[in-house]
Design a protein with these regions (language model features):
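C-terminal catalytic "cap/lid" subdomain
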Residues: 1-279
Length: 279
């Protein structure tokens, strides 16, 4: 099973308000349509929040339940997110990819931002039907915080216990995880993240330079590190050319930053997991 997250920085104008880049969505849809025989039943798609997921909570004070939000606005994150998921589903359908959108607050409950209970069985049915499951972040209900904003970067971890994930690819608006020189001008790509260097690489990551409330590159890398210690390969790479998707999914050493797992997925059992990062 492969999971690809296409960043909101690619599929929307991230500094706007609910401003989709329909042409980019269509290009990804058409590429996946061409490869559908190979991908159907093996691929889960996640779309980033972009100017939906990161702008709506600011407009309606829903970034955090401690803010003065209004009850009549509680629905707005989910309504707008599902508008975005529906648009993606519609474009994929027009291009010949059968999709099914999942609304995240309907199947996940968190406690202090961490997923506590979630129901993945319907996703397995969608995959068995050779339909592409499509996910996004959302406002989700939280036992200790009332609600929280759940990033699309954290969706892949919901599948790891139930499915044998091979690789999770995150396509975004930079080449991968970059290291900046001291005056912040020169930057070089970090090609590989391992059990040995992940602490140092994490120090290079930070928030997004665009409108973003979920932690930018840092949250992305942390999510992929937790997956690495469950035996899942991770890739962070540029998706400004949608043609980069297939090599990112299938090449042994894809462009961008490769996060090499430090347990063997094939033999992985709970007790085997060598957790040095966070699970
Ligand atoms: N070390 C780093 N290397 C590369 N980018 C970094 C680094 N640290 C922070 N960033 C920022 O992280 C951004 C990518 O994260 P961001 O969450 O904005 O992307 P996305 O996943 O495409 O969007 P969305 O979260 O809306 O889906 C980059 O554009 C950059 O501004
Ligand atoms: C999508 C929501 C609700 C939050 C933001 O999501 P992300 O930009 O995909 O991390």
């Amino acid at each position: 099973m492969y999971v690809v997250k296409i960043g909101g920085s690619l599929l929307t104008n991230k500094d706007g308000y609910c401003a989709p880049n329909r042409e980019m969505v269509r290009q990804y849809a058409s590429l996946i349509a061409k490869e559908w025989d190979r991908l159907s039943g093996n691929l889960i798609l996640i779309v980033g929040g972009g100017s939906y997921g990161n702008a709506v909570p600011i407009r309606y004070n829903l970034k955090d339940a401690s803010l003065p939000w209004r009850e009549q606005d509680l629905s707005m994150m989910t309504v707008k997110m599902f508008e975005w998921l529906s648009l993606v589903t519609e474009i994929f359908r027009e291009e010949g990819v059968p999709c099914y959108p999942f609304q995240t607050s309907g199947y996940v409950i968190t406690d202090d931002k961490h997923p506590l209970r979630y129901f993945i069985e319907p996703v397995q049915h969608v995959l068995e039907t050779n339909v592409l499951p499509v996910f996004s972040g959302d406002l989700v209900f939280d036992l200790s915080r009332k609600f929280t904003i759940f990033s699309s970067d954290n969706i892949p971890e919901l599948f790891v216990e139930r499915m044998r994930l091979t690789r999770v690819v995150m396509m975004t608006d930079v080449e991968g995880v970059m290291r900046f020189d001291q005056d912040g001008h020169e930057r070089t790509l970090i090609p590989t993240v391992t059990k040995e260097n992940f602490r140092e690489v994490l120090l290079c990551t930070g928030p997004s330079r665009k409108q973003d409330i979920t932690g930018g590159m840092k949250n992305k890398l942390e999510a992929l590190l937790r997956l690495a210690e469950r035996g899942v390969e991770g890739v962070i790479t540029s998706g400004s050319d949608p043609e980069a998707l297939l090599p990112a999914l299938f090449d042994e050493r894809p462009a961008g930053t490769f996060i090499r797992p430090w347990v063997n997925n094939m033999r992985r059992q709970k007790a085997d997991v060598d957790c040095v990062f966070g699970m």
